[in-house]
Amino acid sequence: MKIGIPREIKNNENRVGLSPSGVHALVESGHTVLVETNAGSGSFFEDVDYKEAGAEIVAEQAKVWDVDMVIKVKEPLESEYPYFKEGLVLFTYLHLANEEKLTQALIDRKVISIAYETVQLPDRSLPLLSPMSEVAGRMSAQVGAEFLQKLNGGMGILLGGVPGVPKGKVTIIGGGQAGTNAAKIALGLGADVTILDVNPKRLQQLDDLFGGRVHTIMSNPLNIELYVKQSDLVIGAVLIPGAKAPRLVTEDMIKQMKNGSVIIDIAIDQGGIFETTDKITTHDDPTYIKHGVVHYAVANMPGAVPRTSTLALNNATLPYALMLANKGYREAFKSNQPLSLGLNTYKGHVTNKGVAEAFEMEYKSVEEALHL
């Protein structure tokens, strides 16, 4: 199989689809890998590293897309749509429930698109999303602490406080991978941390994990309002695989927050959980202020720590990439049900229910679309 690794063009996206070691594994399995010039430079992998791993370095963006399978990090941008072709396997993060134009382009060009974030194991865990959820969660507490500083628009609060001064209050909505990792860092900074989740069993697990050092609260509209308005930092970390994020925090709740408080919307790439995160921001211009509250809505948070993120992502995605390359997508889907759940579009059909519902499109199951 011929595989392409393009350079990411999203604002300040410095990750790359595969590390040199990942490329080497594919080449050793008999595949041809084309890597776009400087694709790995943001993660401090040089072209020579990829060449030594067996890749062919190509300068033309069109050439790296003229392959059997493209492995990326983030969803293609509009300038990349012309490279779509029937039968192309696209393996990347897609978050299509918030990307109607991209979804339509994939359907129109009959692309076989496999989204990292919807590959799901029998225990409902998301193996290709988890590493980036860990990174984004940990970053969210660090970023929140940074933007609480007065010089960054915040109210000038130190999350850990000092003796005789209250700690900063951090509320995390969602107790999954991202929320749990946000809590780890916020606790490490010395903050007063509350996690809200809809699953009582998960709250019990979190209470055990943190030894009672975090407040665990059932998530419902009344509790969300109560804790949001008294918080210095609110982190949104709710995920419904493949579907748009629910708008759990209303504009009225935001209006009740203190001036200079901060919200971090980790779920912004799926539409966000705050009614007031009505636009996606970038690492170049990460925040805006609305109702006196600092809003951080960067959709590719892990892109700011690309070396760590690329290596973590490569560890998770490579076994699936090898499976797709070695077996072909049909046999790979037949033999690995979790991977088949990653299929979002197939030759003109939407094969993810959450995406189909988001845009009122016709849904076909993977088995029906592929006649498995």
Swiss-Prot record:
Its EC number is 1.4.1.1. It catalyses: L-alanine + NAD(+) + H2O = pyruvate + NH4(+) + NADH + H(+). Keywords: NAD, Oxidoreductase. GO terms for cellular component: plasma membrane. One of its GO terms (molecular function) is alanine dehydrogenase activity. It comes from the Bacteria. NAD(+) binds at residues 169-199. PROSITE patterns: ALADH_PNT_1, ALADH_PNT_2. The keyword Oxidoreductase applies. The active site is at 95. Pathway: Amino-acid degradation; L-alanine degradation via dehydrogenase pathway; NH(3) and pyruvate from L-alanine: step 1/1. GO terms for biological process: L-alanine catabolic process. Belongs to the AlaDH/PNT family. May play a role in cell wall synthesis as L-alanine is an important constituent of the peptidoglycan layer. This is Alanine dehydrogenase 2. It comes from Staphylococcus aureus (strain MRSA252). The gene is ald2.
